[in-house]
Amino acid sequence: MGANTSSKAPVFDENEDVNFDHFEILRAIGKGSFGKVCIVRKNDTKKMYAMKYMNKQKCVERNEVRNVFKELQIMQGLEHPFLVNLWYSFQDEEDMFMVVDLLLGGDLRYHLQQNVHFQEDTVKLFICELAMALDYLQSQRIIHRDMKPDNILLDEHGHVHITDFNIAAMLPKETRITTVAGTKPYMAPEMFTSRKETGYSFAVDWWSLGVTAYELLRGRRPYHIRSSTSSKEIVNMFETAIVTYPSAWSQEMVSLLKKLLEPNPDQRFSHLTDIQNFPYMSDMNWDAVLQKRLIPGFIPTKGRLNCDPTFELEEMILESKPLHKKKKRLAKREKEMKKSDSSQTCLLQEHLDAVQKEFIIFNREKVKSDFNQRQANLALEQTKNNTEEEEDGQNNNL
């Protein structure tokens, strides 16, 4: 499936925007909200990434372009050890691309489906790492709104990383959100009763953390909610159902989960300090957590892809527009567009042209390089000013 077979890495202009030709496509590994995901290698640095690609025409037809743009906007401003971070975004005539951290440990949903039994100490560390990620998002005024095992990836050492910001929301200060979005079994009670006057805030992500932690420990969720369950039934369930906790779990873990699964958002644990100050976490070295120096109790199997192998078959056999045939397809498409003059084709092209114009190109390497250069220039300028001040002082003393 590789796009480049040459042993000699091509030379790219440093000032050129990163594009599809800068990567070697290795294999498909999954599906995102609006597209598919594959492993890629950057030709110049040989670094490995995950590349998510979204077909523009499908996004236009499903009215999903704005969601993609919003996700890009949010991810460009984020960087944290327990997030899946964006490195590049670019486009061609057919697709929009997001190149992110490659995490080969699989998502937590995959491991649950493989009947992995997560021990309490493992889940305890997961809670700490995810709490640090949520605290960072909160500091950036971001609500994820879709925290669940499917959107938590493991790296090769077993540390967790939050991904998929497709329905995340930016929350201006002194405001609350009223729009309903998320995956029902993980949505907080206040999201189902949200009104314009009340709304909801960051606490919804901490409820999702509680549901996820419970599910990892028990293999099922605390409430029997499905995507087909009506909002009315869910509200009634929150008011009447009693969450049970196995006797094998420590009382400290049960107490923590109860704080996260508190129906009243004002009383729910919803800050990192709530977790840090909880007696159960008194033995936790939080600097070591942030620096990933604590060894998780579950480490994904090395030497294998922790994902559904059918994704590769879909890409190679079933996919109507496989990525490895992109160049030929784009050349053919250009010829067909020149021949076609139907009003429907013209309208679609107008929308695609708008996407092309408004798409946000991003290069984290360049952003970091520019920042480091500015810092170096400032340091040089400061040194120069200090030297001049010292010389002026010496002259004044003469």
Swiss-Prot record:
Domain of life from the UniProt record: Eukaryota
Domain Protein kinase: 23-281
Bias kind Acidic residues: ranges: 388-398
One Pfam family here: Pkinase
Region of interest: Disordered: 379-398
GO cellular component labels: plasma membrane
Single GO MF annotation: metal ion binding
Enzymatic reactions: L-seryl-[protein] + ATP = O-phospho-L-seryl-[protein] + ADP + H(+); L-threonyl-[protein] + ATP = O-phospho-L-threonyl-[protein] + ADP + H(+)
Source organism per UniProt: Mus musculus (Mouse)
Gene3D superfamilies: Phosphorylase Kinase, domain 1, Transferase(Phosphotransferase) domain 1
Keyword check for Cytoplasm: no
Enzyme Commission number(s): 2.7.11.1
Active site: 146
Protein name as catalogued: Serine/threonine-protein kinase 32A
Compartments, record wording: Cell membrane
PROSITE patterns assigned to the protein according to its UniProt record, in alphabetical order: PROTEIN_KINASE_ATP, PROTEIN_KINASE_DOM, PROTEIN_KINASE_ST
